[in-house]
Swiss-Prot record:
Keyword entries, A-Z: Ribonucleoprotein, Ribosomal protein, RNA-binding, rRNA-binding, tRNA-binding
Family: Belongs to the universal ribosomal protein uL5 family.
NCBIfam families in the record: PRK00010.1 (NF000585)
Upper taxonomic lineage: Bacteria, Pseudomonadati, Campylobacterota, Epsilonproteobacteria, Campylobacterales
GO BP terms, alphabetized: translation
Name of the molecule in the record: Large ribosomal subunit protein uL5
Quaternary structure annotation from Swiss-Prot or TrEMBL: Part of the 50S ribosomal subunit; part of the 5S rRNA/L5/L18/L25 subcomplex. Contacts the 5S rRNA and the P site tRNA. Forms a bridge to the 30S subunit in the 70S ribosome.
Pfam families xrefs: Ribosomal_L5, Ribosomal_L5_C
GO cellular component, one term: ribosome
Native species: Campylobacter lari (strain RM2100 / D67 / ATCC BAA-1060)
Biological role: This is one of the proteins that bind and probably mediate the attachment of the 5S RNA into the large ribosomal subunit, where it forms part of the central protuberance. In the 70S ribosome it contacts protein S13 of the 30S subunit (bridge B1b), connecting the 2 subunits; this bridge is implicated in subunit movement. Contacts the P site tRNA; the 5S rRNA and some of its associated proteins might help stabilize positioning of ribosome-bound tRNAs.
Amino acid sequence: MMRLKEKYTQNIKPALVKEFDIKNPMLIPFIEKVVISVGAGELAKDQKVLQNVADTISLIAGQKAVITKAKKSVAGFKVREGFPVGVMVTLRKDNMYAFLDKLITIALPRVKDFRGLPRDGFDGRGNYNFGLDEQLMFPEVEYDKILRTHGMNISIVTTAKSDKEAQKLLELFGVPFAKGK
């Protein structure tokens, strides 16, 4: 059993029930999925670089990443329908807990001058979004094999009804938020 999954069932669930006075056990908030995405932009023009980005995200996530394609042509961005525009992977269950554990305990502490994740990344529906500037903080990524550094967006989707519930859930998981607010 995953460390964070065990922590959720033994410690976090009872704490959430107590804090938010939840009567129905099916209403206890949990993390549904984690989506990691990279908008390739200029990188999408070079197929080799885009494949390298997909391989890197696959290494980080522990699951095969998918190259996303444009749904519509947009002349202003010089994008045609069907052109590759990014890379994404959706993590659920054990892969999700493994990634979150790695992110919280290994990757985020390696970020230079890290003061916590911003609290304004909540969307009003209990989901949290934040971005990372580069992929080199993850231990699986080898600097020599990277063609270009790139950032990534990480979305943590929860079943929480409010931002307050979602923030408490993530804090109990050990997500380091910035001080203030």
